[in-house]
């Protein structure tokens, strides 16, 4: 197990849709261990595999003391609406208000191939949508209004140049 370095915008791995996990290999097991260890830090709600440089459909979460993971997640339902602050480990230092569905449900598998269903409202619902966005090659900045998005991307470019 290892705490992995977080990739930040504009790293291309964050913009590439992740591949489905076709087989549970030792490398996939190590990936899950690394995701769980890396997300296990105060203030971290979720972490997708591409945020640590691996383009596979997997994420870990740490919400209200519940830590876990899901492989090959599919966002199958969302409803309601919430509007609130959102941040991202791959966009350090920036928080913006974003609109998301309040409730979300994701279905995937665990390392033994068993079905996993994660669902929730509020922070859990936001995290499920946020991590599925990552796995599809999107970051939360894509959900911002045009001017806020431009401002955030400018900030990230300037941060990278330093």
From Swiss-Prot:
EC number: 3.5.1.88
Free-text remark on how the cofactor is bound: Binds 1 Fe(2+) ion.
Molecular function as annotated in GO: metal ion binding; peptide deformylase activity
Keyword Repeat: no
Source organism superkingdom: Bacteria
UniProt keyword terms in alphabetical order: Hydrolase, Iron, Metal-binding, Protein biosynthesis
Cofactor: Fe(2+)
Active site location: 131
GO biological process: co-translational protein modification; translation
Recorded catalytic activity of this chain's protein: N-terminal N-formyl-L-methionyl-[peptide] + H2O = N-terminal L-methionyl-[peptide] + formate
CDD domains: Pep_deformylase
List of residues binding Fe cation: 88, 130, 134
Family: Belongs to the polypeptide deformylase family.
Functional description taken from the UniProt entry: Removes the formyl group from the N-terminal Met of newly synthesized proteins. Requires at least a dipeptide for an efficient rate of reaction. N-terminal L-methionine is a prerequisite for activity but the enzyme has broad specificity at other positions.
The protein's name in its UniProt record: Peptide deformylase 2
Organism of provenance: Bifidobacterium longum (strain NCC 2705)
């Amino acid at each position: 197990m290892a705490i992995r370095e977080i990739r930040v915008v504009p790293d291309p791995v964050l913009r590439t849709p992740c591949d489905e996990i076709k087989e549970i290999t030792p490398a996939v097991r190590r990936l899950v261990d690394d995701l769980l260890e890396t997300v296990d830090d105060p203030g971290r709600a979720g972490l997708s595999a591409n945020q640590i440089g691996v383009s596979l459909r997997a994420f870990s979460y740490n919400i209200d003391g519940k830590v876990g993971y899901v492989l090959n997640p599919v966002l199958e339902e969302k409803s309601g609406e919430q509007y609130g602050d959102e941040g991202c480990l791959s966009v350090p230092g920036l928080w913006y208000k974003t609109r998301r569905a309040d409730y979300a449900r994701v279905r995937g598998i665990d390392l033994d191939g068993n079905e996993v269903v994660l669902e929730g409202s509020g922070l859990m619902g936001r995290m499920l949508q946020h991590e599925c966005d990552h796995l599809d090659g999107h970051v939360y900045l894509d959900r911002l209004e045009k001017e806020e998005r431009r401002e955030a991307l400018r900030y990230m470019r300037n941060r990278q140049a330093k």
